[in-house]
Regions:
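Catalytic P-loop NTP-binding/switch module of NTPases
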Residues: 41-42, 49-75
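Active-site adenylate/phosphate-handling loop in enzymes that bind or generate adenylated species
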Residues: 1, 113, 143, 167-228
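A conserved beta-strand->alpha-helix junction
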Residues: 47-56, 117-122, 126-175, 181, ...
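CN hydrolase (nitrilase-like) catalytic-core segments centered on the catalytic cysteine
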Residues: 1-48
Length: 228
């Protein structure tokens, strides 16, 4: 829209080109666009990939603007692949809870790196439903993930509860819930360290805004794709 407005205001053909790639939270789409004084978009490359674009100035065919949702998916995938590559990694690992956040992060990682480069860990506790575990397995199958580990956290959770009982007595409520989340974080980091994987956190921006994420739990990771 801004490019169109500049072309209309200046009554001139205006072009813009952008670099491609990710630099931490800064994402560049590699777009080449040209707008005419009448507001039409006459040149638009595919974007989100390196390459060279040759413009035919005689071709005035109008192009529709990219779909915002497609752009968001491409941007997040670009951010993941760029960060993973620049930190010297090839594959990632994340916890799969059967919920939407981890499903979305796993999907974005599969788009960015290929499903064979995405390692998932299901970490059920006594409170986990069979449906959650089934959903995580189904997600991995649909994405074509070849690395899916199932590690129960009950022994770790119970050991932590027993360790805290002399100091706290009954371990319940938020403290008990967060122990489970942090036990999962330890397992994700353990697999990451042992196999040279980059851990992805699965919290989202809304949770961060209201303090709902668990420090060292679902915030545990080198990159938080849904953080912004």
């Amino acid at each position: 829209d801004r490019l169109r407005q500049v072309a209309q205001r200046t009554k001139a053909t205006v072009g813009v080109l952008n670099q491609f790639g990710a630099h931490d939270e800064l994402l560049f789409d590699g777009r080449v666009m040209v707008a005419e004084p009448n507001g039409s978009l006459t040149h638009l490359n595919a974007g989100w990939q390196p390459g060279m674009t040759v413009l035919d100035w005689d071709n005035k065919e109008s192009h529709a603007e990219p779909d915002p949702l497609d752009e968001l998916v491409h941007a997040l995938a670009c951010g993941i692949s760029g960060y993973v590559r620049k930190t010297g990694h090839e594959s990632v690992v994340l916890g799969l809870s059967g919920g939407l956040d981890s499903a979305l992060v796993a999907t974005l990682a599969a788009i960015a790196l290929g499903p064979e480069a995405v390692h998932g860990i299901c970490m059920p506790s006594r409170y986990s439903s069979s449906g959650s575990l089934d959903d995580a397995r189904d997600l991995a199958a649909r994405l074509g993930m070849v690395h899916l580990h199932e590690i129960g956290i009950e022994p770790i959770h119970e050991a932590l509860r027993q360790s805290l009982q002399p100091a706290l007595g009954e371990v319940a409520g938020v403290t008990d819930e967060n122990l489970q989340a942090r036990a999962r974080g330890v397992l994700v980091m353990g697999l990451a360290n042992a196999q040279g994987l980059l851990p992805l956190a699965t919290g989202n921006k809304s949770e961060l805004a209201v303090g709902y994420s668990t420090l060292y739990g679902d915030m545990c990771g080198a990159l938080l794709p849904l953080g912004d």
